[in-house]
UniProtKB/Swiss-Prot annotation:
Metal-binding found in the keyword field: no
GO cellular component, one term: ribonucleoprotein complex
HAMAP family the UniProt entry points to: Ribosomal_eS17
Keyword line: Ribonucleoprotein, Ribosomal protein
Family: Belongs to the eukaryotic ribosomal protein eS17 family.
Gene Ontology molecular function: any one: structural constituent of ribosome
An individual GO BP term: translation
Pfam families documented for this protein: Ribosomal_S17e
Protein name as annotated: Small ribosomal subunit protein eS17
SUPFAM superfamilies per the UniProt record, alphabetical: Rps17e-like
Gene, per the UniProt record: rps17e
Length: 67
């Protein structure tokens, strides 16, 4: 079983994904840079977790599992 992500990470990732749907791709490194540009988060760990969750959301959308 995997770990459950914190609410802050999920909420921030969803907000970014909803506001800027065309900015993100399935590439984690690209998403990491975009999260850094679009937010004021200074923690590298938080940035990476948010970028990872955004990458997951992009993949799920492409597979048609989320609207």
């Amino acid at each position: 079983m995997g770990n459950i992500k914190q609410g802050f990470i999920k909420r921030t990732a969803r907000e970014l994904f909803d506001r800027y749907p065309n900015e993100f791709t399935r590439d984690f490194e690209h998403n990491k840079k975009k999260v850094e540009e679009l937010t004021n988060i200074t923690s590298k760990t938080m940035r990476n977790r948010i970028a990872g969750y955004v990458t997951r959301l992009v993949r799920l959308k492409e597979e048609g599992k989320i609207l």
